[in-house]
Amino acid sequence: AVPDKIDRRESGYV
């Protein structure tokens, strides 16, 4: 997913 405020859990974006 995209490192967005919602998809950060998928992308590893903390």
UniProtKB/Swiss-Prot annotation:
Record keywords: Disulfide bond, Hydrolase, Lysosome, Protease, Thiol protease
Reactions listed under catalytic activity: Specificity close to that of papain. As compared to cathepsin B, cathepsin L exhibits higher activity toward protein substrates, but has little activity on Z-Arg-Arg-NHMec, and no peptidyl-dipeptidase activity
Annotated GO MF terms: cysteine-type endopeptidase activity
Protein name from the UniProt record: Cathepsin L2
EC nos: 3.4.22.15
Protein task: Thiol protease that assists the parasite in burrowing through the gut wall and liver of its mammalian host.
Similarity-based family: Belongs to the peptidase C1 family.
GO process annotations (BP): proteolysis
Subcellular location as annotated: Lysosome
Organism whose genome encodes this protein: Fasciola hepatica (Liver fluke)
Domain of life, source organism: Eukaryota
One GO CC term on file: lysosome
Subunit structure: Dimer of a heavy and a light chain linked by disulfide bonds.
